[in-house]
Amino acid sequence: MNDHEVDVLVVGAGLGGLSTAMFLARQGVRVLVVERRPGLSPYPRAAGQNPRTMELLRIGGVADEVVRADDIRGTQGDFVIRLAESVRGEILRTVSESFDDMVAATEPCTPAGWAMLSQDKLEPILLAQARKHGGAIRFGTRLLSFRQHDDDAGAGVTARLAGPDGEYDLRAGYLVGADGNRSLVRESLGIGRYGHGTLTHMVGVIFDADLSGIMEPGTTGWYYLHHPEFKGTFGPTDRPDRHTLFVEYDPDEGERPEDFTPQRCVELIGLALDAPEVKPELVDIQGWEMAARIAERWREGRVFLAGDAAKVTPPTGGMSGNAAVADGFDLAWKLAAVLQGQAGAGLLDTYEDERKVAAELVVAEALAIYAQRMAPHMAEVWDKSVGYPETLLGFRYRSSAVLATDDDPARVENPLTPSGRPGFRGPHVLVSRHGERLSTVDLFGDGWTLLAGELGADWVAAAEAVSAELGVPVRAYRVGAGLTDPESAVSERYGIGKAGASLVRPDGIVAWRTDEAAADAAQTLEGVLRRVLDR
């Protein structure tokens, strides 16, 4: 890789930035990440990977490694979610009795499961995979400024960077600002934000302690604490003896993070556990703001926003880090398609069209969960929730990269009864291929996928011809010809009948479908791909 020229420059090595880099590198794109810190964050922060994220990480080739590294599920027992006065005190409400409750809600919708890996364990996996495929990272390197241009050398972005050896310019085709809530990239572009704003202020305490005598045997979990002296949360990390306590404070009452001295934090831990005899070893104490904000624009020319730079999500529901991974995947497959000549630049407009609306769903759901579990006075946000499974797996994309055939304004559908309509995830159907049992979802990724009904041989032939003509990878499968559908569910759930076909994007989203044969299938399919790829 040229030290001063790359295809894509990513600013920020959090989940959004590293996901973008990993998915780009896997597609052969020259990508560089710059991170102002000397290394990745050592703190747990966001934890948990939902099934949609695991679907994407399967495509990225790291899902199995994530599951193997999941120490919370692997060694710390079952996972409960409760509202309580304290960990050993009165239980006010049980949200989930077991990890199996969460699995049961989504298992019929996807072949991917859940994982509970914390951010400090996931980020090194993403970075290693990015490096394996040629991606690079420069720690201790700050973005100072950038400018977009279209000159004799072509269109691009020139970034001024400051690294260990001084300042220098780096030229990139595109720049991705994944530099967090206080994004320099976003602020430099003058992009405002909207949303609920600040919800509360919290102090996070990470501590080590043996709580085997405190927790229920064979159980760990997340506790929303409504203690007479404070309100906050308690939860585990990947390390069995490392835990987190988050306590709310009120600046309007003169409270400050500095008030949470080590002695005070030890007292609060004792109250949270209802176990003053515990002697915790404090690892870190940090103040932070819980907020809900979404950037008004996610793209400005050749510059994009991803992760917390694009939206700040309350941590309730564990969706913030997952949304960052989804941002990275969406942006990566579209940038790669444009850079490799498979798509026109108009495809990049669909990043904001799709991910911004998805962010609104995620933020609304996280707000509703926060209100239900921590702030009942915020009942007005409850009705903005569309449901947790619907937010994760039933969302709908609307953009020029989706050729919808209906005018249904609904933003989501029940993922337990998927429609297979354009804009939604391709439904999970168990099939067999070459004697191997798998899901239709396992067929997606690393290019486009066409699923044809039993009488859809012409669509399969068309996919092969159009793929060669346009230089766009399209893998085609036909029910009854190498793809066995024992429940006869593919045609129904994908809405393609016996003679039709469904075209699925690299991210598993249905781009187009028909339930009929075509007089000239190749011409029809080529027209579809040209439209969705802005060719």
UniProtKB/Swiss-Prot annotation:
Keywords for the protein's UniProt record, in alphabetical order: Antibiotic biosynthesis, FAD, Flavoprotein, NAD, NADP, Nucleotide-binding, Oxidoreductase
Reactions this protein catalyses: aklavinone + NADPH + O2 + H(+) = epsilon-rhodomycinone + NADP(+) + H2O
Matches recorded under InterPro entries: FAD-bd (IPR002938), FAD/NAD-bd_sf (IPR036188), RIFMO-like (IPR050641)
Record: residues binding aklavinone: G317
EC number(s) on file: 1.14.13.180
Residues that, per the record, bind FAD: L15, G16, E35, Q119, L143, D308
GO BP annotations, alphabetical order: daunorubicin biosynthetic process
Entry GO MF terms: FAD binding; oxidoreductase activity, acting on paired donors, with incorporation or reduction of molecular oxygen, NAD(P)H as one donor, and incorporation of one atom of oxygen
Cofactor needs: FAD
SUPFAM superfamilies xref list: FAD/NAD(P)-binding domain
Residues that span the membrane, as ranges: none
pH dependence text: Optimum pH is near 7.4.
Outcome when changing R373M: Hydroxylase activity similar as the wild-type enzyme
Activity modulation comment: Inhibited by phenylglyoxal and 2,3-butanedione. NADP provides a partial protection against inhibition by phenylglyoxal. Increasing the methanol concentration in the assay causes inhibition of the enzyme.
Residue positions of the active site: Y224
Pfam families with a match to the protein in the record: FAD_binding_3 (PF01494), Rng_hyd_C (PF21274)
Temperature-related behavior of activity: Optimum temperature is 37 degrees Celsius.
Pathway where it operates: Antibiotic biosynthesis; daunorubicin biosynthesis; Antibiotic biosynthesis; carminomycin biosynthesis; Antibiotic biosynthesis; rhodomycin biosynthesis
Role: Involved in the biosynthesis of the anthracyclines carminomycin, rhodomycin and daunorubicin (daunomycin) which are aromatic polyketide antibiotics that exhibit high cytotoxicity and are widely applied in the chemotherapy of a variety of cancers. It can use both NAD or NADP but it is slowly inactivated in the presence of NADH.
Matching NCBIfam families: AkvoneHdxseDnrF (NF046068), AkvoneHdxseRdmE (NF046069)
Family stated for the protein in its record: Belongs to the PheA/TfdB FAD monooxygenase family.
Subunit structure and binding partners: Monomer.
Protein name, as recorded: Aklavinone 12-hydroxylase RdmE
Source species: Streptomyces purpurascens
